[in-house]
Amino acid sequence: SAWLDVNDSATVVSSKENFERFSSDVQQQLQQWSSNGFLHIKQHFSNQQVDDVNRAVDELIHQKHLPITHDNKVMYGYKHSPVIKQMMQDGGLKKLLSFILDKEVVPFQTLNFVKGSGQRAHSDSIHMTTYPLGYLIAAWIALEDIHPDSGPLFYYRGSHKLPYLLNDDFENYSTRLKLGNKQYSDY
């Protein structure tokens, strides 16, 4: 697992190289990583950047470059839009995520939601498993004002310390050429 999941972040993170480069708010949240498992960064991107990404997503949908999936997702927009790719590759965000993992992060996917997915509690690691375990990290970027009825992301504090559940734990065997046959509700 990543170093902040193995150690107590409250005692070790402040001595880590480059810790001082982060704002005091981010530093305080990093010290709580071991117990929380997430950071809440406000206004990392400007309103203009957010507006630009929203326009880019709308253009991709209207030009039919990327269809909206059955669950209101626009997947891999960064492959078709330099604006979305620029946000995904944001240097400050990558430095923070790399600091948390103590490895250089490699962004590999964007999901834009037309409206909140309303997805139930789940673990992303069952679908995107890293080897060794513990090196999956995500950034959820709100591109609109968030309220309880908008289908916002939720996270259970400390759930990053729970044992990993993998597809094999559900007898849902997949190969490179075949996906398993389990439904979402089976998980």
Model regions and ranges:
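Double-stranded beta-helix
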Residues: 149-187
